[in-house]
Design a protein with these regions (language model features):
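Pre-active-site segment of Zn-dependent metallo-hydrolases
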Residues: 15-67, 119-147, 173-190, 290
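Active-site neighborhood of phospho(di)ester-bond hydrolases with catalytic His/Asp-centered motifs
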Residues: 24-28, 46-54, 74-77, 167-173, ...
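Active-site environment of divalent metal-dependent phosphoester hydrolases
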Residues: 31-32, 55-60, 80-83, 101-103, ...
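Active-site HxH/HxHxD metal-binding segment of metal-dependent hydrolases
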Residues: 38-123
Length: 292
C-alpha cells in the first residue's frame, strides 16, 4: 500500500493523502501578502476539503477549488451555510460537522473539536489600518468582514486513516488562550499519532505545553501567517525555537518544520520536496462526485 503523506502548501493549506484519497485543510493559493507559492492546479486531486475557520486566508479559495474538483466540503454550520447561500455550492456537496461531532467518508474517519484563537478585533484592525494608511491591512479587514464567515467557530479535526493512524489538525491552537485543562481533555478524548499545528509569534512555550500533553509520535509545525504578520508589522520567534520546544515536550517524537513544498511520509517520517505544477500541466479531475 502506498504510504500516507502530508503536504504543506503554505499558509494553513495542508493535504493528507491515504489509500488513494486526498483531504485538504484550508486550501489557499492566490498571491497574497507577497507570497505566491502554488496555484489551483496543485489542488486538483482534492476529494475532500475541511475548513477550520472563516478567516479569509483559510477560506477564500475553497469555493473555486470545490467547484473545479467537485470535492466535498466539510465545515461548521456557519461555514457551510456561507458556502451554500453566499457562494452557491450545492447542498449535496457540503457536509456540516460542528464541534465534537464525527463521521466517516471513504478513506477517512473524521472527528472535530474546538480550539481557541488568539484575540483578533476586526473593528480595531480597520481603525488601525485607517490611521496608518495601511491599504493592505484595510483590504484584509474589509475582505474578512464581507467575503468570508469571519466569526465561524474555530474547529480542529482528527482524521483516522485506514491503517488506524490518527492525524490531528490543531491549526492555531498552540497559544496562550488554550488552558491546560482543555488540552488535557483533548488528550483524553483522542489518541494522537501525528499533530499538524501552526508555529507563530511568541507562542514557543505553548507549543511545548501542548505537545507535552498530547504526546504525538510526529509533530509537523508550519508557519501559518509569516507573510501576513510581516505586513502587519509583527514577527515570530525563529523556527528552531518552536521545533526545540516541541522536541522538549515529546522527546521521542519526530519533529519537522514545514516550509511550502514539504512532503512528509507518515510511515517512516522521511521528508521530501514537491514542486508547483506549471500552468496547464495537469487537467483538473472530471466532474464526478466523491460524496459519501
Amino acid at each position: 500500500m502506498t504510504p500516507a503523506t502530508v503536504r504543506y502548501f503554505g499558509w494553513s493549506a495542508l493535504s493528507v493523502t491515504a489509500a488513494g484519497r486526498t483531504l485538504y485543510f484550508d486550501p489557499f493559493y492566490r498571491p497574497y501578502c507577497g507570497a505566491d507559492w502554488f496555484s489551483i492546479e496543485d489542488f486538483a486531486d482534492a476529494d475532500y476539503i475541511a475548513v477550520t475557520h472563516g478567516h479569509e486566508e483559510h477560506f477564500l479559495d475553497v469555493p473555486e477549488i470545490a467547484r473545479r474538483t467537485r470535492a466535498q466540503v466539510i465545515g461548521s454550520s456557519a461555514a457551510t451555510r456561507f458556502l451554500r447561500w453566499r457562494r452557491g455550492l450545492p447542498a449535496e456537496r457540503l457536509l456540516t460537522l460542528d464541534r465534537d461531532q464525527s463521521t466517516s467518508v471513504p478513506g477517512f474517519g473524521i472527528a472535530t473539536f474546538g480550539w481557541k484563537h488568539r484575540d483578533i478585533n476586526l473593528v480595531r484592525s480597520v481603525t488601525k489600518a485607517l490611521l496608518r494608511g495601511n491599504t493592505t491591512q484595510l483590504a484584509w479587514a474589509w475582505s474578512s468582514a464581507t467575503r468570508a464567515p469571519f466569526y465561524a467557530p474555530y474547529k480542529g479535526y482528527v482524521l483516522t486513516l485506514p491503517d488506524g493512524t490518527t492525524v490531528m489538525n490543531y491549526n492555531e491552537g498552540f497559544n496562550t488562550k488554550m488552558t491546560d485543562r482543555e488540552i488535557s481533555e483533548l488528550a483524553q478524548r483522542f489518541r494522537v499519532d501525528v499533530v499538524l499545528a501552526g508555529m507563530q509569534l511568541d507562542f514557543v512555550a505553548d507549543v511545548r505545553r501542548g505537545v507535552a500533553v498530547l504526546q504525538p509520535k510526529m509533530v509537523l509545525l508550519y508557519p501559518p501567517h509569516e507573510k501576513f504578520h510581516a505586513m502587519m508589522g509583527a514577527s515570530s520567534r525563529p523556527w528552531s525555537e518552536f521545533t526545540a520546544a516541541a522536541q522538549a515536550g515529546a522527546p521521542h517524537a519526530r519533529v519537522v518544520a514545514l516550509a511550502p513544498g514539504t512532503q512528509v511520509n507518515l510511515d517512516d517520517g522521511t521528508v521530501s520536496r514537491f514542486e508547483r505544477r506549471p500552468p496547464g500541466q495537469r487537467a483538473l479531475r472530471k466532474e464526478t462526485s466523491v460524496a459519501a
